[in-house]
């Protein structure tokens, strides 16, 4: 594992800390290591939730390492499994990822956060996609995911001028889930992670699968699709041990014990 990446397991929760002074910028080597970490998370049956954050209090990540670019690393370089930052192109990850944004999330750093399922950010966090000012485009998900969250006028201004969005504005638009003080950031992310652990893993996997498959469909078409039997997790949930355990635990006034089957 890269020296720039620190992994901590807390039971079913994996914390990934990107730590590359001064701005947690990501070069190809670091991206490969992040991809390996996220794929291992995906495939480890004991892990349920991942939290990705940046080292320090100023930068979550400044995105692509422009020093590496100046030394010849191309924008279309091989950034390894999962695409840039290891997460932006993993499309079969059925476990939730929380981005704990501790500071500036610029360019690929913002794209990394957008690839997560939840964003918890510190009050000093801000978000931007300044690639057009550098002669490139935010093609690691920014230009694809941001239009699903914001009105076209706001998206156009952010991607074409690189304007920054504050944490509070991001909260108002629904881009982030929570804004907390810097000192409360990781506690808040861990609290959310534990809430996710308390939910049935098969149900969460099915929800992510349904979102991916039906997000562009009309509601009626989506109903037909999820009931057609083509999905992997949704049919399994309906006849799972967890589907019996949930109501039984509720009736017995106890916490459910999920088996993931």
Swiss-Prot record:
The protein's name in its UniProt record: Carnitinyl-CoA dehydratase
Family affiliation: Belongs to the enoyl-CoA hydratase/isomerase family.
Biological source species: Salmonella paratyphi B (strain ATCC BAA-1250 / SPB7)
Active site: 111 (nucleophile), 131 (proton acceptor)
UniProt entry keywords in alphabetical sequence: Lyase
Catalytic activity: (R)-carnitinyl-CoA = crotonobetainyl-CoA + H2O
Statement: the UniProt record of this protein carries the keyword Lyase: yes
Coiled-coil portions: none
Pfam families assigned: ECH_1 (PF00378)
NCBIfam families: PRK03580.1 (NF002936)
Biological pathway: Amine and polyamine metabolism; carnitine metabolism
EC number of this enzyme: 4.2.1.149
InterPro entries for this protein: Carnitinyl_CoA_dehydratase (IPR022852), ClpP/crotonase-like_dom_sf (IPR029045), Enoyl-CoA_hyd/isom_CS (IPR018376), Enoyl-CoA_hydra/iso (IPR001753), Enoyl-CoA_hydra_C (IPR014748)
UniProt enzyme class: lyase
Biological processes, Gene Ontology terms: carnitine metabolic process; fatty acid beta-oxidation
HAMAP family listed in its UniProt record: CaiD
PROSITE patterns from the UniProt entry: ENOYL_COA_HYDRATASE
Molecular function GO terms recorded: hydro-lyase activity; L-carnitine CoA-transferase activity
Function in brief: Catalyzes the reversible dehydration of L-carnitinyl-CoA to crotonobetainyl-CoA.
